């Protein structure tokens, strides 16, 4: 049935993302069974043709492919552990966000019960689920990914299989979210900085967009430097860049703004300079990230 792209699917967990996943399966024509602790969250999906299971066990029995999306692995394991017998022989895809270590622990639990287990990470917000550009990362059971790749395409057209280690998809998830939250914090802080002098966010936003467009080319150089542990400072060294950060901090503090995130960056730069790397490029701070202060 998987090859026909109409495999019966079960979705456990109907938060905003779980509802989007179940809705995408329904839109693609998959018989879809849903379960959530708060049963009313299934109402809209049932109106679209989903079957509401009364219990997790009933939900699992209805699906050839079982997809879980809850708040963390503590919750997912609390739901799944009593269902080892029902899940045996089925394909389980866990799209819950958590640490690589917890994903590997869950994989070991599944392997001990004959459950074919694939871990995954959703890298888009709910409105993008089901679209060709929706990026989902998977790692773990290759057999599940290959057997149900067409089914999983209902969730997004940009699926990536990252290998047999169940911890890789969560690792990529957290690393990419690190980029996202750090960038968002920087953007919001910058808007607070210009806003303190009366510039609106809308006025300044075009300049942020132009500035972000410079980053991809810089990222290539950073990645090469990190892989080779070579951090040329010919285009800008840490000593020079630290002075620029000091100016930002001074300007922020003069306006009564919290400068915590940037102060942490400046402290990291200071450690690198103290270690004798003031002439290196910014990427050399990775050496200090790899040996955090006790």
Residue ranges and their predicted role:
Residues 168-264, 268-293:
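Helical "substrate-binding/catalytic lid" subdomain
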Residues 1-68, 90-91:
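NAD(P)+-binding Rossmann beta1-loop-alpha1 motif at the extreme N-terminus of oxidoreductases
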Residues 32, 52, 116-118, 159, ...:
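Hydrophobic beta-strand scaffold residues
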Residues 97-177, 181:
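Rossmann-fold dinucleotide-binding core
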Residues 56-116:
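Rossmann-fold NAD(P) dinucleotide-binding segment
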């Amino acid at each position: 049935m998987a090859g026909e792209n109409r495999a019966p699917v079960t979705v456990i967990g109907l938060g905003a993302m779980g509802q989007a996943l179940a809705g995408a399966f329904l839109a693609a024509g998959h018989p879809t069974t849903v379960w959530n602790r708060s049963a009313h969250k299934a109402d809209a999906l049932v109106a679209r043709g989903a079957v509401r299971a009364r219990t997790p066990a009933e939900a699992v029995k209805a699906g050839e492919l079982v997809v879980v999306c809850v708040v963390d692995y503590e919750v997912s394991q609390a739901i799944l552990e009593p269902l080892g017998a029902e899940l045996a022989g089925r394909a389980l895809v866990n799209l819950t966000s958590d640490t690589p270590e917890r994903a590997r622990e869950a994989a070991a639990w599944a392997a001990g019960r004959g459950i074919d287990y694939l871990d995954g990470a959703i890298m888009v917000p709910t409105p993008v689920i089901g679209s060709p550009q929706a990026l989902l990362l998977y790692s773990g059971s290759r057999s599940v990914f290959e057997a149900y790749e067409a089914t999983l395409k209902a969730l997004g057209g940009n699926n990536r299989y990252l290998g047999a280690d169940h911890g890789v998809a969560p690792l990529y998830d957290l690393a990419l979210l690190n980029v996202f939250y750090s960038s968002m914090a920087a953007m919001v802080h910058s808007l607070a900085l210009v806003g303190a002098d009366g510039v609106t966010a809308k006025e300044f936003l075009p300049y942020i967009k132009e500035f972000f467009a410079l980053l991809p080319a810089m990222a290539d150089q950073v990645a090469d430097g990190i892989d080779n542990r070579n951090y040329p400072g010919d285009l800008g060294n840490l000593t020079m860049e630290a002075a620029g950060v000091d100016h930002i901090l001074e300007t922020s503090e003069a306006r009564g703004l919290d400068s915590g995130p940037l102060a942490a960056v400046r402290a990291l730069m200071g450690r690198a300079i103290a270690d004798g790397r003031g002439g290196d490029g910014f990427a050399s701070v990775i050496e200090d990230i790899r040996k955090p202060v006790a």
